[in-house]
UniProtKB/Swiss-Prot annotation:
Gene from which this protein is expressed: MFAP3
Membrane side Cytoplasmic: residue ranges: 171-362
Main localisation: membrane
A Pfam family it matches: ig
Lineage: Eukaryota, Metazoa, Chordata, Craniata, Vertebrata
Keyword Metal-binding: no
Disulfide bonds: C73-C124
Protein name as it appears in the record: Microfibril-associated glycoprotein 3
GO terms for cellular component: extracellular region; plasma membrane
Record's bilayer topology term: Single-pass type I membrane protein
Native organism: Homo sapiens
InterPro entries tied to this protein: Ig-like_dom (IPR007110), Ig-like_dom_sf (IPR036179), Ig-like_fold (IPR013783), Ig_sub (IPR003599), Ig_sub2 (IPR003598), Immunoglobulin_dom (IPR013151)
């Protein structure tokens, strides 16, 4: 049962009996007031409690069951014998019908001991000086029997059932919120792979937020709900693998760029494509006007300042790193070879290459 339906039933069960009680009080006050006003008519018995002046503008008279009522015909008649009364069933009312229940006196219709069946429309007809009619509606409040008690019992039963349902719903909601809060606290204390599983379990337990939630509960759970949503968002972002794979790929590319691992086949092709340098292209001329250094050795030779500059031919060759390593290996191998003593004098005038002396000048 929805909350607004329960509240509507509760309000109806309280307001309707109160309305009937207030209506009964107002009716009793009206009866006592109109009984005093009707004392001027001496022809009416003292048992009449209502007069014709009690009808309202819409010509409706309300009477309790078991009381007496008097209805006045507001039409002008030359003789009172010309006034005739009829009920809603079309029966003409006079003193002889029903053992004197309806009494017609002048232009008044007196009904004694009103019953619930007497309700309806009462019409008076006037034949002189002109033909006219006037109607009054009589409403009777049913008081005999156990209807009021039955109605009160039904209202109390409905109110009790509604109250029990509301209390049960509030208790279930409170228990559910306590369990959810406990699960959220356990989620914050959980680390590792179990955190995602806890998140899914808590997401299943969170109820749909409706207007039935009170403001106090919303304030209490607002902070933890926001924190939980933030953790869920972080977990959702960490689940997809493509960003992680892209980061690993970028890391591997950076590592290869730092190491510079070259393919040997590509290295040989680049060596073949490199143009050879000739002797003339590898000679660089030092500017004769270049000044001497400021070293102490240079300053000590004062006579060399007046000497003219000389041209020095220098041949430069560019070698790759692999070629340099091979040259270093060959130089280390040649250092282990010791030349014979008999040609020690010629060592200064010979070029040693590949284990033999070339261009020796003796």
């Amino acid at each position: 049962m929805k909350l607004h339906c329960c509240l509507f039933t509760l309000v109806a069960s309280i307001i309707v009996p109160a309305a009937f009680v207030l209506e009964d009080v107002d009716f009793d006050q009206m009866v006592s007031l109109e009984a005093n006003r009707s004392s001027y008519n001496a022809s009416f018995p003292s048992s009449f409690e209502l007069s014709a002046s009690s009808h309202s503008d819409d010509d409706v008279i309300i009477a309790k069951e078991g009381t007496s009522v008097s209805i006045e015909c507001l039409l002008t008649a030359s003789h009172y014998e010309d006034v005739h009364w009829h009920n809603s069933k079309g029966q003409q009312l006079d003193g002889r019908s029903r053992g004197g229940k309806w009494l017609v006196s002048d232009n008044f219709l007196n009904i004694t001991n009103v019953a619930f069946d007497d309700r309806g429309l009462y019409t008076c007809f006037v034949t002189s000086p002109i033909r006219a009619s006037y109607s009054v509606t009589l409403r009777v409040i049913f008081t005999s029997g156990d209807m009021s008690v039955y109605y009160m019992i039904v209202c109390l039963i409905a109110f009790t059932i509604t109250l029990i349902l509301n209390v049960t719903r509030l208790c279930m909601m409170s228990s559910h919120l306590r369990k959810t809060e406990k699960a959220i606290n356990e989620f914050f204390r959980t680390e590792g792979a179990e955190k995602l599983q806890k998140a899914f379990e808590i997401a299943k337990r969170i109820p749909i937020i409706t207007s039935a939630k009170t403001l106090e509960l919303a304030k209490v759970t607002q902070f933890k709900t926001m924190e939980f949503a933030r953790y869920i968002e972080e977990l959702a972002r960490s689940v997809p693998l493509p960003p992680l794979i892209l980061n690993c790929r970028a890391f591997v590319e950076e590592m290869f760029e730092a190491v510079r691992v070259d393919d040997p086949d590509d290295l040989g092709e680049r060596i073949k494509e490199r143009p050879a340098l000739n002797a003339q292209g590898g000679i660089y001329v030092i500017n004769p006007e270049m000044g001497r250094s400021n070293s102490p050795g240079g300053d000590s030779d004062d006579g060399s300042l007046n000497e003219q500059g000389q041209e020095i031919a220098v041949q430069v060759s560019v070698h790759l790193q692999s070629e340099t390593k091979s040259i270093d290996t060959e130089s280390q191998g040649s250092s282990h070879f010791s030349p014979p003593d008999d040609i020690g004098s010629a060592e200064s005038n010979c070029n040693y290459k590949d284990g033999a002396y070339e261009n020796c000048q003796l």
